[in-house]
């Protein structure tokens, strides 16, 4: 007979340390917003009352990368801005995650020229891509939910226990 049966309806929760840490990490992400173009307007809309990102523990945007664990890159990244994005990413504490919001952040979008980075994954590792030009706030929220699922499947050393299959 396991502890689950012995505890009955006492309100006791049994979980591993890894599950508790991942639950707290996924429910209290503090974003560092990097709005570079029109996607930033939709990102701001996602924080309004209609969509309310605070229900995901993201009600406060961090101005300092040392206080953030999630970077949302929204829009095109120029070659001159690339070192700044990398420096801010390096200043974030581990564990840290990145969402590339919009087609420009994911692959350069319509700006296929020498001055624009053809995807922010050339600069920093990206965990979730949110497609659209610009993506709606619902798409950003869907990307955040997918990131939460990924974080909940991580080991304490930062590797995935199992692959994440998104529908």
From Swiss-Prot:
This is NADH-quinone oxidoreductase subunit B 1. GO terms for molecular function: 4 iron, 4 sulfur cluster binding; iron ion binding; NADH dehydrogenase (ubiquinone) activity; NADH:ubiquinone reductase (non-electrogenic) activity; quinone binding. The gene is nuoB1. The lineage of its organism: Bacteria, Bacillati, Chloroflexota, Chloroflexia, Chloroflexales. It is an enzyme of class 7 (translocase). Binds 1 [4Fe-4S] cluster. NDH-1 is composed of 14 different subunits. Subunits NuoB, C, D, E, F, and G constitute the peripheral sector of the complex. GO terms for biological process: aerobic respiration; electron transport coupled proton transport. It is a peripheral membrane protein. It comes from the Bacteria. It is found in: Cell membrane. Its cofactor is [4Fe-4S] cluster. SUPFAM superfamilies: HydA/Nqo6-like. It catalyses: a quinone + NADH + 5 H(+)(in) = a quinol + NAD(+) + 4 H(+)(out). NDH-1 shuttles electrons from NADH, via FMN and iron-sulfur (Fe-S) centers, to quinones in the respiratory chain. The immediate electron acceptor for the enzyme in this species is believed to be ubiquinone. Couples the redox reaction to proton translocation (for every two electrons transferred, four hydrogen ions are translocated across the cytoplasmic membrane), and thus conserves the redox energy in a proton gradient.
